């Protein structure tokens, strides 16, 4: 458990952890490339290590170090055993598609209790459109998933754009193996598009090209066939999702902090956290590779469309508790499909602290109360809730006890140590 007490001031320089999204994609691309790739500044978090270990089961050789992963990639082979991806939905979804392109045999992918509840049916249906054979062993669209190797026989696939972007990423990373050019057609407007831009960016670095289709009656992506993944040296940038908790702490508390390893020109959608706190009234300075904050700031409630930034919702919910007026979060139906139903979880747990928060079908309405009280909070094995609630606890009167703090190893393994280094009053017990 994590015990958090009111923190009077934070001060110091700290780095945002490497991007989870970029690390996942880079290690899988490198594993598919015939040759040696050097991945610098990878995230050594549980989810990304799940991707690395899964790729090793498909035949990649990976030397894992804190500052660099050396990946010797090759054509994927049939795994000798069931591929257990732990708690990583990204790993499960990307490798479900790619495992269909091994030369022979079957792949079985599964994970922990949480993963075995995450929806997979839209991806399975899309792969079946391509002529591939895959299914849920429970016949309910969840893991364990069985995938049979096979050739892609149809080159147009339709899929909703408003479910999980990970389904589309899986198709993007699988279709370059087709003998013919392919199209992914989106049947509904895209949500979480920045994650697809990250996929396209990483694929480009590893030699795979994807073009966007933007026609009057057709939106999607075009992928040339017979493309080869090529090895490269790749540096992974800092993670704006993880940096959002540092930003929130900086604008709410008496602070003087510099957050390094976040880039002004990043393609990450969650860089929007900077614009959000500015619109709420914070004078945050964004430089080429760092953010400077000298708080606290008097915040005002605003309306925020979270279509492309679902991972920021817990951070926004905490900010809204201390803002003047109402903070409205909308277009967030997909936020319910993360590690837990984050809309329900934020409502339930922050209310225990005295927050005035209303859950809507697609979002939240938070009325600023300016003061929270310590409470015992559940986090539903969700790393983002642990970190967002920590910031709430640092602002609250009394003591806040947060369960499940070990889940931060997924995306920000040294979160507690870094927060303590700048003066946060937190302890693991």
From Swiss-Prot:
Give the residues the record marks as binding 3-phosphoshikimate: 20-21, 25, 164-166, 192, 311, 338
What organism does the record attribute this protein to? Answer: Methanococcus maripaludis (strain C7 / ATCC BAA-1331)
Compartments where found = Cytoplasm
Q: Name one GO cellular component term.
A: cytoplasm
The positions annotated for binding phosphoenolpyruvate are 20, 89, 118, 166, 342, 384
Question: Which molecular function GO terms apply here?
Answer: 3-phosphoshikimate 1-carboxyvinyltransferase activity
A Gene Ontology biological process in which this protein takes part is: amino acid biosynthetic process
The organism's taxonomy opens as: Archaea, Methanobacteriati, Methanobacteriota, Methanomada group, Methanococci
In its UniProt entry, what is this protein called? Answer: 3-phosphoshikimate 1-carboxyvinyltransferase
């Amino acid at each position: 458990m994590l015990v958090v007490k009111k923190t009077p001031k934070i001060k110091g320089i700290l780095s945002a952890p490497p991007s989870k999204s970029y690390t996942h994609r880079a290690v899988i691309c490198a594993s598919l490339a015939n040759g040696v790739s050097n991945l610098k500044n990878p995230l050594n978090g549980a989810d990304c290590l799940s991707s690395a270990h899964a790729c090793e089961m498909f035949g990649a050789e990976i030397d894992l170090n804190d500052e660099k992963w050396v990946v010797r990639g090759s054509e994927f082979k049939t795994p000798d055993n069931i591929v257990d991806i732990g708690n990583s939905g990204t790993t499960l979804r990307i490798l479900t598609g790619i495992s269909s392109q091994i030369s022979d045999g079957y792949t079985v992918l599964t994970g922990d209790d949480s993963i075995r509840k995450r929806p997979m049916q839209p991806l399975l249906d899309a792969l079946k459109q391509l002529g591939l054979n895959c299914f849920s062993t429970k016949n309910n669209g969840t893991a364990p998933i069985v995938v049979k190797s096979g050739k892609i026989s149809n080159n147009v696939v339709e899929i909703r754009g408003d479910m999980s972007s990970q389904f589309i990423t899986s198709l993007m990373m699988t279709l370059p193996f087709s003998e013919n050019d392919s199209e992914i057609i989106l049947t509904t407007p895209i949500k979480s598009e920045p994650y697809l831009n990250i996929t396209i960016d990483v694929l480009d670095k590893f030699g795979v090209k994807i073009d966007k289709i933007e026609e009057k009656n057709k939106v999607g992506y075009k992928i040339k066939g017979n493309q080869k993944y090529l090895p490269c040296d790749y540096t992974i940038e800092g993670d704006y999702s993880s940096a959002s908790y540092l930003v929130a702490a900086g604008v709410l508390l008496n602070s003087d902090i510099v957050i390094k390893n976040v880039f002004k020109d990043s393609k990450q959608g969650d860089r929007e956290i900077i614009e959000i706190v500015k619109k709420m009234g914070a004078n945050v300075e964004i430089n080429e590779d760092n953010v400077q904050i000298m708080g606290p700031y008097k915040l005002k409630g605003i309306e925020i469309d979270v279509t492309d930034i679902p991972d920021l919702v817990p951070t926004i919910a905490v900010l809204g508790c201390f803002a003047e007026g109402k903070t409205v979060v909308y277009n967030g139906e997909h936020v319910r499909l993360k590690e837990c139903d984050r809309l329900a979880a934020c409502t339930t747990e922050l209310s225990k602290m005295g927050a005035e928060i209303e859950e809507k079908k697609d979002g939240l309405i938070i009325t600023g109360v300016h003061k929270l009280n310590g409470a015992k909070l559940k986090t539903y094995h969700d790393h983002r809730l642990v970190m967002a609630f920590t910031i709430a606890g640092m602002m609250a009167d009394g003591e806040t006890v947060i369960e499940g703090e070990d889940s931060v190893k997924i995306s920000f393994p040294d979160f507690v140590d870094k927060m303590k280094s700048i003066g946060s009053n937190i302890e693991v017990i």
